[in-house]
């Protein structure tokens, strides 16, 4: 039996919620932006009126203002976005319990067993009309026989539209589209493909396995399967909890970081949050990954393994900083830093030590970190901290970016 998969994408979600809650913003160009003072002064979302002026997500506010002098800037209200995201999922739940979120504003739905409610298109259209009537928001929906093409369909027509991609006609409909439109083909992959003259989904579908594996590894074989409609990944049930794959924190600093000492201070603060999340999820880090974005907005990433899985923020910070110092060349000041704990192990997993492991030192450090955490829990996070953190910090006082990543359905 062929599956019927929907992908529902709430159009310009943040901006649409703001405009719905503030009717005076209707028909005005609106951009939801972070705090200018704390260097989150970029466009997080924009409505279609702003898009018509060329305003782009991710650009600085001053750049957006140059394109549209009448642009209305509003601050994000995340509690409202969470509320409306939940309300939308409650509507989806009227049709199936197989609902898999893909971010706050997107979901896959498997309605294969909901045939009594209509065809895939009919169900998608009813959901679209219900969300519009009950929530005042619009969605675009893709209807297909797998998750990859359902997602592609929801991107093809916006806003407030439905696109069907059928098994017997998908080649004619999507093989002419840019390869970058396919989920799993990011900017780096697109650049590699285009360098070899592979520009469309159809060209990707016809490329040899050996060539793709040589140039892109396992991901190359995966995206070729997607291009040929070969995706059998399931839509998870609404109550399914994905295993955690990595835990991290990232921050955009109030001022650019200009030396190793400033980066060290930032990493020390970030790993304290990571430690808390590791404890919450009962995990230990078996590796560290860092992502560094410079003031030219170019990002570099590195990762390494940790010989002994740990929750120690001190050990995590030292490992992250060592990785940074070894690789970053200081060609430009740094705008943002992200640290992630990867290769996670269960908290109570048995540990195999080698002959060269300083077990006493490691145990002493972990007990010290645990004592510090208890003091912070009882008296507040500023009750005790590293001496270098008492100097003037470039860390913003408000929002850090939590990165708790479940295992993905792709790859």
Label each region the model flagged.
Residues 102-106, 144-147, 283-287, 332-336:
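Short Gly/Ser/Thr- and Asp/Glu-enriched loop/turn motifs at secondary-structure junctions
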Residues 315, 321-378:
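C-terminal hydrophobic structural anchor segments
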Residues 107-113, 301-304, 352-357:
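Short, hydrophobic beta-strand segments
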Residues 72-73, 298-302, 349-350:
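Short small-residue beta-strand/loop micro-motif enriched in glycine and branched aliphatics
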Residues 1-225, 235-238, 276, 359-411:
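Gly/Gly-Pro- and Ser/Thr-rich, intrinsically disordered tail segments characteristic of DNA damage-repair
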Residues 13, 36-39, 295-298, 344-347:
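Short, charged/polar surface micro-motifs in flexible loops or helix N-caps
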Residues 138-140, 289, 336-338:
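Residues at or immediately flanking beta-strands
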Residues 7, 189-333:
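DNA-contacting surface of Y-family translesion DNA polymerases
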């Amino acid at each position: 039996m062929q599956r019927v998969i929907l992908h529902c994408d709430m159009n310009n979600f943040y901006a649409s919620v703001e405009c719905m809650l503030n009717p005076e913003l209707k028909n005005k160009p609106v951009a939801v932006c972070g705090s200018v003072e704390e260097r989150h002064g970029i466009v997080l979302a924009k409505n279609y009126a702003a898009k018509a002026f060329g305003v782009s997500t991710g650009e600085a506010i001053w750049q957006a203002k140059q394109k549209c002098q009448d642009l209305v800037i509003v601050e994000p209200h995340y509690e409202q976005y969470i509320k409306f995201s939940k309300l939308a999922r409650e509507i989806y739940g009227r049709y199936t319990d197989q609902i898999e979120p893909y971010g706050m504003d997107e979901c896959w739905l498997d309605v294969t067993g909901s045939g009594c409610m209509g065809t895939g298109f009919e169900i998608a259209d009813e959901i679209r009309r219900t969300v519009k009537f009950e929530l005042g928001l619009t969605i675009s929906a893709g209807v297909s026989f797998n998750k990859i093409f359902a997602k592609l369909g929801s991107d093809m027509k916006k806003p407030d539209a439905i696109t069907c991609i059928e098994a017997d006609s998908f080649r004619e409909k999507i093989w002419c589209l840019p390869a970058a439109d396919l989920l799993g083909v990011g900017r780096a992959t697109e650049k590699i493909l285009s360098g070899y003259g592979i520009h469309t989904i159809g060209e990707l579908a016809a490329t040899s396995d050996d060539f793709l594996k040589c140039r892109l590894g396992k991901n190359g074989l995966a995206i070729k399967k997607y291009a040929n409609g070969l995706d059998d990944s399931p839509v998870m049930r609404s109550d399914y909890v994905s295993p955690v794959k990595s835990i991290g924190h990232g921050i955009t600093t109030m001022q650019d970081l200009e030396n190793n000492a400033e980066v060290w201070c930032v990493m020390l603060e970030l790993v304290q949050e990571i430690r808390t999340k590791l404890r919450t999820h009962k995990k230990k880090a078996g590796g560290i990954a860092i992502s560094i974005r410079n003031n030219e907005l170019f990002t570099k990433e590195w990762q390494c393994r940790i010989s002994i899985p740990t929750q120690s923020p001190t050990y995590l910070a030292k490992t992250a900083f060592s990785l940074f110092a070894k690789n970053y060349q200081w060609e430009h000041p740094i705008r943002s830093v992200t640290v992630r704990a990867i290769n996670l192990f269960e908290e109570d997993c048995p540990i195999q030590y080698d002959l060269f492991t300083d077990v006493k030192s490691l145990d002493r450090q972990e007990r010290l970190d645990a004592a510090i955490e208890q003091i912070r829990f009882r008296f507040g996070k500023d009750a005790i901290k590293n001496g270098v953190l008492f100097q003037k910090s470039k860390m913003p006082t408000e929002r850090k970016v939590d990165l708790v990543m479940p295992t993905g359905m792709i790859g």
